[in-house]
Amino acid sequence: MKTLIYSILILIGALSVAACANDVLPKPKGGLRLDYPQAAYSRVTDLPNCPFTFEANTLSAIEHKANSCDVNINYPTMKATIYLTYKNVDGNIRKLLTDAQNFTYKHTVKADNIAATTFVNDTTKVYGMFYQVYGNAASQSQFYATDSVKHFISGSIYFNVEPNYDSVQPASNYLQKDMRRIMETLRWK
């Protein structure tokens, strides 16, 4: 009987020792998953004395600066804003284009890359460039659009957080689609 008890105790002890082994397992890579609602757009026409209209995401809040045609498109849930700045073209198109391009390329200090895409819509006479900025730059996307004769508008995305590319990338990708939509739906009055 004693040997049976000793055998059971030895078996329990061996199982206890074997069960306490900590196998180190690699943790699977995880990524930040943020799901944003499907974008719905409506035409922004209530900008007094401004010679343009465009479509904006219905999730945004439009803030129009009095006595100017500057527009802030706020996204409170993402802590982001698309800033639109309008200028009249008065024989200064070259300066406006140079300023917009220089403004974008000032981000090269922090940016890993800047990809430029040409935008042309002959039907609506909207011509411009869209810039996607990669890396920890302050602005992840910028654009300008013009008719080359009377109108010039520029836009940029800024987040109200420290520019950590990995953290803002999901929201930035969502807002880049909105920014492209602004360019595509821009109409001069």
Regions found by a protein language model. Give the residues of each.
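Surface-exposed amphipathic alpha-helical segments
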Residues: 156-189
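Bacterial signal peptide processing site
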Residues: 21-25
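C-terminal motif of bacterial Sec signal peptides marking the signal peptidase cleavage site
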Residues: 15-19
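Secretory pathway targeting signatures of secreted, lumenal, and periplasmic proteins
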Residues: 48-102
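Bacterial N-terminal signal peptides that target proteins for export
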Residues: 1-8
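Post-signal peptide N-terminal segment of mature Sec-exported envelope proteins
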Residues: 28-49
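Signature of long, low-cysteine stretches enriched in small and polar/charged residues
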Residues: 101-156
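Second-shell loop/turn segments in exported
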Residues: 82-91, 142, 165-173
